[in-house]
């Protein structure tokens, strides 16, 4: 590693397939964090147990997996794993422990009943906008784009939106939620607010209270499920609208 540092090679250490939480592996995680801190390297532990506060000792540890991330869709059928319901459960449970490396961002999306586990061309359960919203909902200081580069080149509008979402936040406001049913969160970075909302397989409307914005005029760049999203999950619509003066926003998912 000394040779790599002298050449200026690499700033992020992503360690995969730890797959254990016995004492030996816990010791390894602590030692790896210490060594990476010495060499001023950031760390993302993938395939590891949930966080337990290590990032407070070693702030260079940005992220942990410790979650059934989107990669599960490569080998799990809809019957075997209901990812859509899982996504509106983990913000209330797993995310309490700390950040999670969920590896989202699928551009191939499948409506209910249409998902297939295809290892070479994996797809997500649920809509395209669902994938976008997870970048706001899920706490993750070091985010990923899980899909193939060719898919992102084809989907430039969504890719540009994802790439502009911050990964660290100055303020977080819980807007609505019920475990395993729906969740809506607003997060602020600087002067900009980002709002994400997810539902389970049940279509629903939410009335969001945006009074936290305070006075002034705001413009909302909105990505929402398209009219056919329940059948064609990639269907979405982008709008740019003024935030209502009464600070009430109705969304349909």
Q: Which stretches of residues belong to each language-model region?
A:
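C-terminal beta-sandwich/jelly-roll accessory domains of carbohydrate-active enzymes
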Residues: 199-253
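Single conserved hydrophobic/aromatic residue that forms the stacking wall/gate
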Residues: 2-13
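Alpha-helix-loop-beta-strand connector modules within alpha/beta enzyme cores
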Residues: 32-45
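Glycan-recognition and catalytic regions of carbohydrate-active enzymes
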Residues: 147-194, 198, 230-234
């Amino acid at each position: 590693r000394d040779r790599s540092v002298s050449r200026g090679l690499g700033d992020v250490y992503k360690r995969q397939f730890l797959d254990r939480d016995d004492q030996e592996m816990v010791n390894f995680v602590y030692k790896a964090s210490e060594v990476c801190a010495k060499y001023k390297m950031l760390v993302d532990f993938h395939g590891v147990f949930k966080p337990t506060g290590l990032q407070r000792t070693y702030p260079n540890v940005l992220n942990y997996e410790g979650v059934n991330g989107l990669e599960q869709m490569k080998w799990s059928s809809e019957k075997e794993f209901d990812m859509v319901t899982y996504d509106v459960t983990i913000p209330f449970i797993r995310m309490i422990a700390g950040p999670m490396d969920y590896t989202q961002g699928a551009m191939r999306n499948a409506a209910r009943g249409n998902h297939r586990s295809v290892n070479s061309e994996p797809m997500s359960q649920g809509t395209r906008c669902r994938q976008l919203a997870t970048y706001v909902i899920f706490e993750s200081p070091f985010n990923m784009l899980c899909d193939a580069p060719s898919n992102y080149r084809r989907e430039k509008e969504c890719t540009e939106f994802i790439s502009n979402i911050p990964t660290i936040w100055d303020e977080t406001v819980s807007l609505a939620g019920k475990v395993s049913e729906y969740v809506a969160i607003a997060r602020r970075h600087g002067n900009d607010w980002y709002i994400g909302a997810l539902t389970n397989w049940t279509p629903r409307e939410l009335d969001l209270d945006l009074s936290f914005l305070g006075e002034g005029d705001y413009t909302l760049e909105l990505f929402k499920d398209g009219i056919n999203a329940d059948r064609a999950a990639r269907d979405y619509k982008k709008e740019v609208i003024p935030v209502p003066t009464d600070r009430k926003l109705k969304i349909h998912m």
